[in-house]
Amino acid sequence: IWSGIQSAF
């Protein structure tokens, strides 16, 4: 999980 996606999840 990269920084952009981990914020969403």
Swiss-Prot record:
<keyword id="KW-0964">Secreted</keyword>
<protein>
    <recommendedName>
        <fullName>Venom peptide 2</fullName>
    </recommendedName>
</protein>
<dbReference type="GO" id="GO:0005576">
    <property type="term" value="C:extracellular region"/>
</dbReference>
